[in-house]
């Protein structure tokens, strides 16, 4: 649930509240004290995060009421599905028809979809995914703000510009005061209800320091907090959860163990999976996925990546393209194609129709300025906007020419 408008509590049962949005009923987990039926709240990611005064809620809803339904109608028009056969093969159409009905596809059928190259057929695939997105989620779109607090990293990932092996970039580490000020600006001035705190695998912050930052944000401002600090250790996941973090953004990059070791020297896929499983057990919302376009990666690998994300109970799927960075061992490997990323997004929607929120990554927007719109019309329904202080953004140099680097 990602509506950034107030909703009215219809019922409360233990830690679960049912919230009404202009007639739509959605559930949220409640950790706030003193809520009653009839109260108005903001909820994000399935969590109640703030109670707001009645007059303020009604004022906001009065502004949004007409627009809310207008936007739903526009979205409905854009998601209409017409599987016109044209020059597309009969088998491909049968598979899409089965998907549009919400029936589970076999592995063989999914491979037919992901291996398709015909432009007309792919347009139908993307339309089918968008139809399913609208049918299950309407025009709900998650918008998260991300603060990149440090570009220090002791890992040596061969695809990443902030790898510890890259000696040619300027490193930075935001102070606690800077992080809190950035969070304040994002929440109070820009209205974000969900924040992602991200860094490289940085030993410069202790777990106690990170926990203190999270506690202070939660104490001062209403927001759902995701962490993205790499593998912090299984015990430390609980410390950060107890401090108030409720989401984890941690990609497994690839479901292929051999490929994982090739691009993450000295690392094991099993360790990454263990972190994701432990986080889910603790109650974290999971954002995970893979990197598309790695050397030696097959279509079967990509399908396995989507299936692994589902197995790991992903609340949000994050699949982004490999973009070559001149200061990495993979500098000469070609960047992924935007079309391949759109195929993965569409298949993720088809595979996890009901639950999945699917992210449009900044890396995809870097490949193609039109890709945010195309991805949102291909099954995606989530975006992350950079709210890192402008002076630090160019230094978080995961890949060159990153989109939105200078936008305020």
Give names to the regions the model predicted:
Residues 233-240, 295-309, 366-377:
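Catalytic cores of alpha/beta
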């Amino acid at each position: 649930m990602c509506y950034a408008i107030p909703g009215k509590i219809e019922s409360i049962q233990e830690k679960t509240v049912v919230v009404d949005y202009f007639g739509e009923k959605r559930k949220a987990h409640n950790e706030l004290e003193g809520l009653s039926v009839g109260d108005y709240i903001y909820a994000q990611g399935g969590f109640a995060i703030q109670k707001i005064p009645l007059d303020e809620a009604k004022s906001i809803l009065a502004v949004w009421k007409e627009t809310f339904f207008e936007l739903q109608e526009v979205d409905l028009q854009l998601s209409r599905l017409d599987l016109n056969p044209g020059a597309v093969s009969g088998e491909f159409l049968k598979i899409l028809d089965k998907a549009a009905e919400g029936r589970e596809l076999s592995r063989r059928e999914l491979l037919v979809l992901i291996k398709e190259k015909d432009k007309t057929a792919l347009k139908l695939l993307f339309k089918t995914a968008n139809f399913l997105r609208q049918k299950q989620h309407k025009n709900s779109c998650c918008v998260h703000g991300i603060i990149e607090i440090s570009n220090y990293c002791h890992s040596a990932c061969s695809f990443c510009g902030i790898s510890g092996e890259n000696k040619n970039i300027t490193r930075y580490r935001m102070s606690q005061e800077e992080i809190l000020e950035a969070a304040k600006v994002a929440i109070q001035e820009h209205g974000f209800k969900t924040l992602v705190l991200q860094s490289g695998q940085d030993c410069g912050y202790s777990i106690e320091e990170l926990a203190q930052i999270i506690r202070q944000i939660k104490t001062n401002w209403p927001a759902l907090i995701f962490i993205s600090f790499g593998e912090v250790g299984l015990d430390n996941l609980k410390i950060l959860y107890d401090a108030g973090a409720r989401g984890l953004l941690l990609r497994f990059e690839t479901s292929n163990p051999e490929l994982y070791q090739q691009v993450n020297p000295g690392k094991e896929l099993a360790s990454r999976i263990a972190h994701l499983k432990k986080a889910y057990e603790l109650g974290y919302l999971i954002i995970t996925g893979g990197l598309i376009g790695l050397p030696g990666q097959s279509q079967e690998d990509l399908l396995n990546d989507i299936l692994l994300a589902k197995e790991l109970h992903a609340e949000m799927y994050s699949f982004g393209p490999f973009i070559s960075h001149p200061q990495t061992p993979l500098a000469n490997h070609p960047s992924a194609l935007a079309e391949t990323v759109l195929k993965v997004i569409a298949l993720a929607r088809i595979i996890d129709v009901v639950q999945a929120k699917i992210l449009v990554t900044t890396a995809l927007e870097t490949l193609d300025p039109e890709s945010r719109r195309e991805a949102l019309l291909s099954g995606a329904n989530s975006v992350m906007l950079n709210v890192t202080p402008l002076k630090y953004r160019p230094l978080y140099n995961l890949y060159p020419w990153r989109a939105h680097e200078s936008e305020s």
